[in-house]
Amino acid sequence: MNKTNPTIALVAGEVSGDILGAGLIRQLKAHYPNARFIGIAGPRMLAEGCETLVDMEELSVMGLAEILKHLPRLLKIRKNVIQTMLQEKPDVYIGIDAPDFNLDVELKLKANGIKTIHYVSPSVWAWRQNRIHKIAKATHQVLAFLPFEKAFYDKFNVPCRFIGHTMADAIPLKPNRAEACQTLQIDPAQRYLAILVGSRGSEVEFLAEPFLKTALLLKEQFPDLQFLVPLVNEKRRIQFETIKAKITPNLDLHLIDGNARQAMIAADATLLASGTAALEAMLCKSPMVVGYRMKPLTYFLAKRLVKTDYISLPNLLANEMLVPEMIQEECTPELLAEKLSVYLSDDESAVKNRHVLIQHFTDLHQKIQCNADKQAAQAVIDLLEGKENV
């Protein structure tokens, strides 16, 4: 490797990966001002000077049906990436998330003497744990957001570095509620529940009804309670409004385009689907209840495949049931309302418990707030310069 101008390959497959890639490139440029960046980039990575082989959107497909439909094109892109990398011989290849695409590329490149890093651990600790052997063969190192992920890799002696979570860096330890209310143009003197029905069509389909009925029950118990409903895009908004018109036509809601983070900061509590949103709610210091429903067959399979005691990231991080998880048959309006009312009550013990929970959230936030972009860049530098022991 040329010490001052390495060629660094990065491949991102969706918006979250583009954000991570751009942050990583920025930090690497500070160390290697003359480095060349190539791969598959989104607009943010392109703005940082990364050359792209194809538009990142080409990789952004979700769901089995969509993947099968686009499979010939995806395989062609993967073949093109492998051929290009074998010709260019970058000093390191960094696959950013997108494991179904990147791990096969990494496997081929590592076998041909190219250093590889996988940035963002697949949920191998939760299900399909045998993937760990492929990851070990494909990568020189995995960069993990969460400490329990590194602990899992350590059990299998697979090189992994915990770098902290970029979201924990982006959200302050003490979020500003007044500012969030101002951004949303809502009255800070009011009491609010944030309702996040998920970003996927299937999540909205399964969760909108129980979540809306929960809101009705809570409105009876707390007549002054108002509801903030951030929706990720126009498609999900139309889908949600259609369900609402049938289920709770007279319920007043503040529908918000995006801005989920501000809604959670402004709210007294949050009702949400599992996933990254639960981690974000924790970082926003919003007491939450996690609700999730899926097709019976999907649930039957998931119960047998998933190897963890909890499904939400706050509970996985704490290794205890910090926030209620109401899954499948437990995800009923009555049970959700019962759990949420504890957070919304003015009762002295409820207020005390709320403070204790928020302190737990703050402690967990501090554990994963490590300047992840910088840590990721340092891991790349250490691998390039032969100091990769962790």
Curated annotation (Swiss-Prot):
Keywords linked to the UniProt accession: Glycosyltransferase, Lipid A biosynthesis, Lipid biosynthesis, Lipid metabolism, Transferase
GO biological process: lipid A biosynthetic process
Keyword Lyase found: no
A single GO cellular-component term on record: membrane
Family matches, as HAMAP family: LpxB
NCBIfam families: lpxB
Protein name per UniProt: Lipid-A-disaccharide synthase
